[in-house]
Amino acid sequence: MSKLQGTKTLQNLINAFAGESQARNRYTYYASIASKEGYKQIEEIFIDTANNEKEHAKLFFKKIAEYIDVTKDALVLPVTGSYPVALGDTLNNLKFAAAGEN
């Protein structure tokens, strides 16, 4: 049993991992829309941002794995949090992205 098992720290780490993971997907969707609308530079910014979110998620995931032995059994943890669901045209997606980073 890990020192983190059942702690608020572990819950915060898994929530952060989930948040960064879903943000990555959201930015990837936004990049696709920007591309379809002909905004190549904005598409690239969304892709870069998605890649940053992936790296953030990886840090949280690795930190969890440092403290919990996940090599033998999968650890299933509940995720608690609120995550935005917003998808529009590129202008609105830029606004959604800015609001989501505050």
Predicted regions mapped to residue ranges:
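Non-heme di-metal
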Residues: M1-N102
